[in-house]
Regions:
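Short helix-coil transition sites and intra-membrane helix breaks within transmembrane domains
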Residues: 23-35, 70-78, 230-246, 262-271
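Small-residue-rich segments of transmembrane alpha-helices in multi-pass membrane proteins
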Residues: 8-20, 63-72, 131-138, 194-208, ...
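Hydrophobic transmembrane alpha-helices that form the pore/transport pathway of multi-pass ion
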Residues: 16-72, 83, 243-256, 285, ...
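Membrane-interface alpha-helices at helix entry/exit sites of multi-pass transporters
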Residues: 10-15, 48-62, 90-100, 251-263, ...
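Transmembrane helical segments that form the transport core of multi-pass membrane transport proteins
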Residues: 1, 16, 150-250
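Membrane-interfacial loop-to-helix junctions in multi-pass transporters
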Residues: 3-18, 47-59, 144-148, 215-228, ...
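Juxtamembrane and boundary regions of transmembrane helices in multi-pass small-molecule transporters
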Residues: 93-139, 274-314
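Hydrophobic alpha-helical transmembrane segments
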Residues: 10-18, 32, 60-61, 96, ...
């Protein structure tokens, strides 16, 4: 229904990118990408060939950056925010105010990027373009029981984030519901990605216990918490960076800014970016290198703008 309310290819591209940006604030960057990247790929395949080829890699890179940048505005948008927000004892309002300038600037940059890309897109006559998009009518009937149940469970999870109820309650409720009503989805979990996270967290935990490394980290972090977090995120991803660096400083506001900006840059800077990359690899393994080039270049540009804003706001 949302797609039917847009006009033309650029309108649909803009909508798909903005959905990732805004919904990542509520459903997390990972879930936003899992939801909307496959939808974007379906739509791109329905475009005329030349137009589809033009947007195929660009829209996924745009959605990935949008999800990572949109998610930085709220405590529940991404794991590092949730962890540092809890560790710092901040209120949700404090975190939102801290990250609002970065989020607002990111939105403006995304809209400019879409318009610049649209200006260089191959020209397709309006009637053919609109007909192609209007042909997207493969809709399934919405299961109201699932919708109601997941909304209730989601609300309970939000109450946990707000420190109103203990985390054990949503953990048990979600697990029971999934086992009783939606067991097949348990087998669809990307356990390899979870295993990667677990191994990375164990490695980071062990690294922080090495005396020589700890003293080195304390020296380089003093007064440079944000930049250290940005650089560390490029190597170990921003969530492990948040876990590691939080043990060596109590300047959690600087770490929140640093790990969110640090989600830009390399492919592993944010683990959510790997989700999009896996979709590209699944579609066409030969395009992995080209996508990585587009992704990295655009991420670096956005990171530069975010760092300029950071130095301006200091």
């Amino acid at each position: 229904k949302l797609l039917m309310g847009t006009s033309g290819t650029v309108g649909v591209i803009r909508l798909l990118v903005l959905l990732c940006f805004f919904l990542s604030m509520v459903i997390t960057n990972d879930v936003a990408l899992i939801t909307f990247v496959p939808l974007a790929l379906i739509i791109v395949h329905k475009l005329p060939k030349e137009l589809g080829n033009y947007w195929f890699l660009k829209i996924v890179a745009m959605q990935t950056i949008a999800a990572n940048l949109g998610s930085m505005l709220t405590p529940i948008g991404n794991p590092q925010n949730l962890y540092l927000y809890a560790r710092a004892g901040m209120s949700a309002a404090e975190l939102i105010i801290l990250m609002l300038p970065y989020s607002a600037t990111s939105l403006i940059l995304l809209l400019i990027w879409i318009q610049l890309a649209a200006a260089k897109a191959p020209h397709v006559c309006g009637s053919e373009k609109d007909k192609t998009l209007l042909g997207f009518s493969d809709r399934k009937e919405l299961n109201m029981e699932y919708l109601a149940a997941y909304l209730i469970l989601f609300t309970i999870c939000l109450l946990t984030v707000a420190r109103i109820i203990p985390y054990q309650i949503p953990l048990v409720l979600v697990l029971i519901y999934m086992l009783l009503r939606n067991r097949e989805n348990i087998s669809r979990v990307d356990y390899s990605l979870l295993a990667t996270f677990i191994a990375l967290f164990i490695f980071i935990g062990n690294l922080g216990r090495i005396p020589q490394f700890s003293s080195f980290l304390e020296r380089i972090m003093a007064g440079r918490e944000t930049l250290t977090a940005v650089l560390a995120s490029q190597i170990m991803s921003n969530v492990p960076a948040a876990l590691l660096l939080s043990g060596f400083t109590d300047n959690y506001r600087a770490l929140i800014v640093g790990t969110n900006i640090g989600g830009l840059g390399t492919l592993i800077a944010s683990m959510a970016s790997l989700i999009s990359f896996k979709y590209i690899a699944k579609e066409n393994r030969n395009l992995r290198g080209k996508y990585l080039g587009i992704f990295t270049a655009s991420n670096i540009i956005f990171m530069i703008f975010m760092l300029i804003l950071y130095f301006f706001l200091r």
